[in-house]
Amino acid sequence: MRKFLKFILSFTLIAILCGCQRTVIFDIYNNHPKIKIGMSISSEGTFLNNVCASAKKAADEHDVQLEILSANNDQKTQSEQIKKWADDNYAAVIVVLCDDTAGKQILENAGTMPVVFINLCPSDHEVLQSKQNVIYIGGKEGDAGRLQGEFLSEYFISQNNNTPTIAVISGESDNFTSNIRIDAAKEAISNAGLMPFYVYESSGGWDKSKTQSDFYKFLQSKPTIDAVLAVNDDMAIGAADALAQAGYALSSIPIVGVDATPEGRAAVRDGRIDFTVYQNPEYQGAGAVNEIMTMLGGDMPNADVDSIQWHEYMPVTAANIDQLFPDDR
């Protein structure tokens, strides 16, 4: 009986504190709180789909409703999604920004809702410290590119190749995550004292099939390709398939990706790609839902200390993949 009274008093207090915002919505038929969370992602792709799946699983475990929408890389659309969820009395939102400068606008549209940014950190970190119920969970995108660049640099130095010819495959030309990774990779290569020639720079749309088709057409003229730098695993695999289709020897062309998705790990094992970097989708997906439930329970993060939860990228090669992912076998 005491536990029941404690349960009722706890949710009564939440309802009073939330007031007209109706953060907790009660189902009068079973007396069970129904919490609605909105999740807006910049675009769809293998990694973000895995993040969404992790978030959905965590939401189901917490018995809350999660609505997931893609903004199709349109920041205006994403801002409107957040505003609608605020108007519809959603409890909180999870956001993968289209534009890393849009954090302030998202918070303005979110109103009093807790906001968890994931995957792409707002460029202005002060945004994360402007409210107690705002945090970021994810990696530093530049680290992913830096690790790619360092891997390629070490390879070319070992081959005494100071002027490598590199193909670069971006996600989309105007995508911040893609651009940050590429810039960091190029900087790492330059810092190693190499003078690369970027023979091919094109968008693969985060997609394996598009990358394979577009890159294969380029390869018809048989250009020299010393390496491929792709900003995700799907495009790295697409590039590898295009090279093989065009008659290139993959064993002499290092191909690097990002995310270490199950497909990417399989490609590392079978030799199609040589390097990827791992970011755990559960840290971002389930992690965001769990943080929201904690905040809705009244435990707010310290804005100065807990507003950013960095998760480091891990390099993945044929040498360490079985140690990092023993359950794949």
Give a label for each model feature.
Residues 1-36, 60, 65, 108, ...:
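Short, low-complexity disordered leader/linker segments with a strong preference
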Residues 35-54, 58, 67-80, 84, ...:
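Extracytoplasmic "Venus flytrap"
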Residues 95-115, 185, 200-265:
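Hydrophobic alpha-helical
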Residues 101, 105-143, 165, 261-269, ...:
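Flexible loop/hinge segments that line or gate small-molecule binding clefts
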